[in-house]
A protein has these predicted regions:
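A structural signal for short loop-to-beta-strand junctions that line the ligand-binding cleft
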Residues: 1-15, 46-47, 157-163, 242-248
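Short glycine- and hydrophobic/aromatic-rich loop-to-beta-strand nucleating segment
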Residues: 6-10, 62, 170-172
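Short helices/loops that flank or line small-molecule/ion binding pockets
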Residues: 14-15, 33-39, 100, 113-127, ...
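Conserved C-terminal helix/tail region of periplasmic/extracytoplasmic solute-binding proteins
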Residues: 16, 22, 235-296
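Glycine-centered hinge/linker elements that transmit conformational signals in sensory
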Residues: 33-39, 78-109
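Extracytoplasmic/periplasmic substrate-binding proteins
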Residues: 57-60, 67, 91-183
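C-terminal lobe and pocket-closing loops
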Residues: 131-143, 153-258, 293-296
Length: 296
């Protein structure tokens, strides 16, 4: 029920000081580079950063560009799927980020959501992150901020496509008493109530999980009163393809850890983008081979 997707947050006050239009965030990755350079020239020590680097820069990046992350429809076609995020487009993107890092335009702040706090503290001016950062930014930021769609490469056919969902799930375990299941059902019914979901979405930035809660939010005027809060929804409701409808792979938590390890080698200047992505794909595919063998 805490479902989110990836968005682009930016500091409008920092944009103003750098001579950038606060109502025109960068739409493409080349524009991100130009904006970052102007922000750095204006004295910003961390022009751009990212949280959840594997999710934002590889997984959502892939679906946003309608490009395979893995074969077999990103794993939906069976356990024989293999990773494919070392394509020329992926390598180009990570190379660009590495070049930004060398110039001080991209500053890596750590795994997971470690880059969230440097954004809402005002240290970092632009960040790719979860849409669920909305509540924390609104509560903590002492500056005017904006939410925009993920940047894309304009020369890639079909981009932008759609982003992928992230978050967590609630599971009901077997072996409990009937009365306990009645309580679980009542709780789930409460959580999925359109009014409750709409309020949660508006408060947190997590996605509304039903059309009724989305429509209630839209009807209330919330999106017009809070520009950018509909970005996550609009990125998700675009038409999907077999390359963009999501990712389903075995041992995915371990694969994400490999992504982090290899990308960190790039940011540290110890590997090229191609070396790191080739290694990540090779190591990840070894896990997928084991998963396939264990689930035949």
């Amino acid at each position: 029920l805490n479902s989110s997707t990836t968005v682009f947050n930016y500091n409008k006050d920092a944009f103003r000081k750098a001579g950038l239009d606060p109502e025109k965030p960068p739409q493409t990755w080349p524009e991100v580079v130009l904006a970052a350079a102007k922000l750095k020239a204006a004295g910003v020590s961390c022009p751009f950063t990212t949280s959840w680097q594997g999710w934002t820069q590889l997984e959502s990046f892939s679906t946003w560009h309608n490009t395979e992350f893995a074969t077999k429809g990103n794993g939906f076609g069976g356990t024989s799927a293999r990773l494919n995020f070392n394509s020329p487009l992926h390598v180009r993107h990570i190379e660009n980020l590495a070049n930004m890092a060398k110039q001080g335009l991209f500053v890596y702040r750590g795994r997971g959501n470690a880059a969230d706090a440097p954004f809402y503290s005002g240290e970092c001016a632009m960040a790719t992150a979860s849409s669920s950062t909305y509540a924390t930014i609104k509560k903590n930021a002492k500056f005017d901020f904006g939410i925009a769609p993920l940047p894309y490469y304009p020369d890639v056919a079909g981009a932008p496509q759609n982003t992928v969902i992230g978050g967590a799930s609630l599971w009901v375990m077997a072996g409990k008493k009937p009365d306990e299941y009645k309580g679980v059902a009542a709780f789930f019914n409460y959580l999925t109530n359109a009014e409750i979901q709409a309020k949660s979405h508006q408060r947190t930035g997590y996605l509304p999980i039903t059309m009724a809660s989305f429509e209630a939010t839209e009807k209330s005027g919330f999106y017009k009163q809070n520009p950018g809060t509909d970005v996550a929804v609009n990125q998700m409701i675009r038409k999907t393809t077999d390359k963009s409808r999501g990712i389903r792979l075995g041992n995915f938590v371990q694969i994400r850890a490999i992504e982090d390890e290899e990308l960190e080698q790039v940011w540290a200047g110890k590997k090229t983008a191609k070396e790191a992505l080739d290694s990540a794909v090779k190591r990840g595919n070894e896990l997928l081979v084991r998963f396939e063998a264990a689930n035949k």
